[in-house]
């Protein structure tokens, strides 16, 4: 039996599609359905590694958890990871499939369409219900001919569509009506209604606006979801980095400074610290902001050499070394760890047009980028250090193209 589908689209990026999709998944899972999430194509700086070593979007991993199932590459067959200079690495069915710019990517539309439809069909054969998430807005009329992720999928799966709008940004009724007006007649028939997300205040003050809107658009507002400040869900495409910052210096607080770079990736490694009351977390993009914290974190990067050069040019690394000599600890994650060595080499220019760059020299090691990408989940135990007790069991993952020589 082929699964039925329901699709969540939005008036734009960041309106709450991923969380609403997860909530719907959870509802049907709790109601006894065998349900799974799906997103045809994702653009994300952050990714999740499945048990089989495949990369997918973190939102689909979170949604799978809401469904009570393990994340599967079928849930997100295409993942695009921006790497700078208008290029993105293409992850096809969980594995790297080269890099390209937007123009070249659209030339692959026919191939990618087959991949997406095959993945969705396989998922529908395994489950009773598939909750599909769109991307951005279905009203991107300049990109409509290459659509893989919004109304194209809704049409193929004969899926009813709910459109989500974000009232916290302002102008939600204009966003929703504008989106609806730019849809074709056939697409409008698929829309079952709208949801207003992130509402603050008195719902009675919103009621007249909803009534007027429903007089202009022949589709109902199905519900209003309140703004929830403490909802902790991994971000995918961007990060409201300054909202995570807290006042440093309080007694008993661990002051942590994260060095911000233009090509930062998998910043979800750090985001849990923002919700720990014992941590004061700040993001640093200027030397004046770095004042001898307890811990400095160099995060991952989609272009390690060019981010390293950027930090040198901004004299941020010089300040990092000064803080280190004054007692600050340094923690490097992925590309940030590679920066702590002697050299980083990219002889095949897999990430950068620059083939070699000197690191900070804090570790006697050298990094060389290779063609084969390693993605896997791991288990480990910590060794005793100033940061960790010995023997703490941890789960984690590896995503890298590099070999480190020690």
For the regions a language model picked out, list residue spans one by one.
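Flexible phosphate-sensing "switch/lid" loops adjacent to ATP/NTP-binding sites
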Residues: 2-322, 329, 349, 371-372, ...
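Catalytic nucleophile serine of serine hydrolases
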Residues: 334
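Conserved phosphate-handling catalytic cores of large alpha/beta enzymes
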Residues: 348-349, 354-356, 371-376
């Amino acid at each position: 039996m082929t699964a039925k589908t329901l699709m969540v689209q939005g008036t734009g990026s960041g309106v709450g599609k991923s969380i609403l999709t997860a909530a719907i998944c959870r509802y049907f899972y709790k109601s006894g359905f065998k349900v799974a999430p799906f997103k045809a194509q994702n653009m994300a700086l952050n990714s999740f590694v499945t048990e089989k070593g495949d990369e997918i979007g973190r939102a689909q991993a979170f949604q799978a958890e809401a469904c009570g199932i393990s994340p599967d590459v079928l849930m997100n067959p295409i993942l695009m990871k921006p790497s700078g200079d208008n290029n993105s690495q293409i992850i096809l069915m969980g594995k790297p499939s080269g890099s390209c710019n937007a123009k070249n990517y659209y030339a692959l539309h026919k191939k990618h369409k087959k991949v997406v439809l095959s993945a969705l069909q396989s998922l529908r054969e395994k489950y009773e219900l598939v909750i599909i998430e769109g991307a951005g807005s279905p009203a991107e009329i300049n990109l409509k001919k290459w659509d893989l992720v919004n109304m194209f999928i809704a049409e193929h799966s004969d899926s009813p569509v709910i459109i989500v709008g974000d009232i916290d940004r302002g102008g939600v009724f204009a966003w929703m009506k504008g989106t609806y007006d730019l849809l074709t007649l056939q697409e409008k028939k698929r829309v079952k209604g709208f949801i207003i997300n992130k509402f603050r205040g008195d719902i009675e003050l919103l009621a007249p606006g909803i009534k007027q809107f429903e007089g202009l658009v022949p589709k109902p507002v199905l519900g209003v979801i309140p703004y929830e400040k403490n909802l902790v869900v991994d971000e995918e495409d961007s990060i409201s980095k300054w909202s995570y910052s807290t006042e440093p210096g309080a007694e008993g607080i661990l002051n942590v400074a994260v060095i911000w770079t233009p090509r930062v990736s998998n910043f979800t490694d750090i985001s849990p610290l923002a919700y720990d009351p014992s941590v004061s977390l700040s993001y640093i993009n200027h030397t004046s902001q770095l004042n001898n914290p307890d811990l400095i974190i160099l995060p991952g990067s989609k272009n390690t050499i060019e981010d390293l050069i950027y930090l040198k040019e901004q004299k941020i690394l010089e300040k990092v070394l000064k803080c280190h000599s004054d007692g600050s600890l340094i923690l490097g994650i992925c590309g940030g760890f590679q920066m702590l060595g002697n050299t980083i080499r990219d002889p095949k220019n897999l990430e950068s047009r620059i083939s070699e760059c000197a690191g900070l020299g804090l570790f006697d090691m050298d990094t060389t980028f290779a063609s084969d990408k390693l993605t896997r989940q791991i288990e480990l135990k910590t060794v005793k250090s100033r940061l960790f007790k010995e023997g703490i069991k941890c789960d984690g993952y590896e995503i890298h193209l590099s070999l480190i020589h020690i």
